[in-house]
Amino acid sequence: MANIKAKKYYSYAKINLFLHILNKRTDGYHNLQTWFTFLDLKDQLTFSFNNSREINISSNISIAAKQDNLVYKAIKKFQQSYRVQDIGVDIEIKKNIPMGAGLGGGSSNAATTLIALRDYYLPQLSNEEMIPLAAKLGADVSIFVYGKSAWAEGIGEILYHKDFSPQYALLIKPDIHISTKEFFTSEDLIKSSVLISKDLGFDKSIMHNDFENVFYAKYPEFSQYLKELDSDFRMTGTGSCFYLLSADKNKLEQLARKINKPLDKWLVKTLNYVY
């Protein structure tokens, strides 16, 4: 079995600077508006292509069975869309992005897989040309293929490049795994009814996360704890990760030391580009 030299890729996390949920579509997805930026919190994926015609995926943590794994689904979609047969590859995933946190770890891994496959099999393809394929894998996969901070509409696949002023971000995550489906169907979800202009700057007074009310209703004790911290933590995606942005790294370090609950914490930077 001939093996090609292994190639490593980084797979970055994202945050939603705001997330407005609009109407439900006939395909079951919801239209939305959001502003994505990236974090220097990242997974590492190593791809070793070979002629085995087998797809093997391993990780440093427990991951979904092959048929339910977004990385595997990305490979199959790539095969079907571009008629690339007999893919043989060993993929090793080193996870650092927490799962079920709203940071897009699984979607990011799927996008990285599409890019690795493109680099090996179809290097003439641009990232933008793969966005329609990415959208078929999930609402967040497109932004990771796009690779730049962006305003997003549709289900997240209509993207407009929009930089965000780089800052530090303190992430905190309770030991809670969120069901996205449950949050979308929650009676506590109050959907946004008014579109806002993508030309606006970051405005906390009109830009919020519609899922925060759902989270706070389900986990009122965590909501109370955030109030006690007296800081403007915001939720990314459907949670359960919250973030606080600041240009002052020391301020965030001091706050992190003040947090006495058993929460996972990261101090990271925002990024406008990941490719």
From Swiss-Prot:
Keywords: ATP-binding, Isoprene biosynthesis, Kinase, Nucleotide-binding, Transferase. One of its GO terms (molecular function) is 4-(cytidine 5'-diphospho)-2-C-methyl-D-erythritol kinase activity. ATP binds at residues 98-108. Pathway: Isoprenoid biosynthesis; isopentenyl diphosphate biosynthesis via DXP pathway; isopentenyl diphosphate from 1-deoxy-D-xylulose 5-phosphate: step 3/6. It catalyses: 4-CDP-2-C-methyl-D-erythritol + ATP = 4-CDP-2-C-methyl-D-erythritol 2-phosphate + ADP + H(+). One of its GO terms (biological process) is isopentenyl diphosphate biosynthetic process, methylerythritol 4-phosphate pathway. The keyword Transferase applies. Its EC number is 2.7.1.148. The active site is at 14, 140. Catalyzes the phosphorylation of the position 2 hydroxy group of 4-diphosphocytidyl-2C-methyl-D-erythritol. Belongs to the GHMP kinase family. IspE subfamily. This is 4-diphosphocytidyl-2-C-methyl-D-erythritol kinase. It comes from Francisella tularensis subsp. tularensis (strain WY96-3418). The gene is ispE.
